[in-house]
């Protein structure tokens, strides 16, 4: 259940000018990989993440996700694929401020029409897995940044997606919380989840097993870390 991009482009019209955010990206990510995507502002890395996450469609090219062609899907098909296969974690957490951590995590199951008792049971189990069972009744403003990001990770996991996409997940965290969050991603990868991480921080990218660098809408390097023999 891997990912394959072939000659993906994404163009935007700005006035009379056409700007290519992606200029022909070809890439394969195997199931169970931990990949970091790096690049300066305007490099195309966020556009690439949006296409990988089925949040946007390319202007041209092919995107196979689990052997399904995604590039030509309509909005409903994209949404179904996204909800089934992908969990998202964002820099700003994107939590609902007026409901508890527990209810935030359970929210995707509301859309999936899972019964309330079952969704709260599943949300409690996942909060326990990320070390927040004692704070499940807390509101987001009663949690630290690291704790809020744990809630966001738990929410991303609630539908048991095969792929986790994280866009600058440590951008608003202190160094200690960043380490804790990256260790969670590492454990999820050990459990078989595919992790795709966008970051501009080299020290965060080093947690990944493969680092892809994007510039001017093109991949300029793709490096796999050597595994220790120990």
Language-model segments: which ranges?
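ABC-family P-loop ATPase nucleotide-binding domain
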Residues: 1-11, 221-230
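ABC family nucleotide-binding domain
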Residues: 2-214
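H-loop (His-switch) and adjacent beta-strand-loop-beta switch element
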Residues: 211-224
């Amino acid at each position: 259940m891997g990912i394959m991009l072939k000659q993906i482009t994404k163009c935007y019209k700005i006035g009379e000018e056409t700007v290519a955010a992606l200029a022909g990206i070809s890439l394969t990510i195997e199931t169970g990989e931990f990949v970091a995507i790096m690049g300066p502002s305007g490099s195309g890395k966020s556009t690439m993440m949006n296409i990988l996450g089925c949040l946007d469609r390319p202007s041209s090219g092919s995107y196979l996700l689990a052997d399904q062609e995604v590039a030509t899907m309509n909005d409903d098909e994209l949404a179904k694929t996204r909800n089934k296969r992908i969990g998202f974690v964002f820099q700003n957490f994107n939590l609902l401020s007026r409901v508890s951590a527990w209810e935030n995590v359970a929210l995707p199951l509301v859309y999936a029409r899972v019964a309330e008792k079952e969704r709260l049971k599943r949300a409690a189990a996942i909060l326990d897995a990320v070390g927040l069972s004692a704070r499940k009744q807390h509101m987001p403003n009663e949690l630290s940044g690291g704790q809020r990001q744990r809630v966001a990770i738990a929410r991303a996991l609630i539908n048991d997606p095969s792929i986790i996409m994280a866009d600058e997940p440590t951008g608003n965290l202190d160094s200690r919380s960043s380490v804790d969050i990256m260790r969670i991603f590492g454990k999820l990868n050990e459990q078989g989840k595919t992790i795709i991480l966008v970051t501009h921080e080299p020290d965060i990218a080093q947690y990944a097993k493969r680092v892809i660098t994007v510039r001017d809408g093109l991949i300029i390097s793709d490096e796999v870390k050597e595994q220790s023999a120990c």
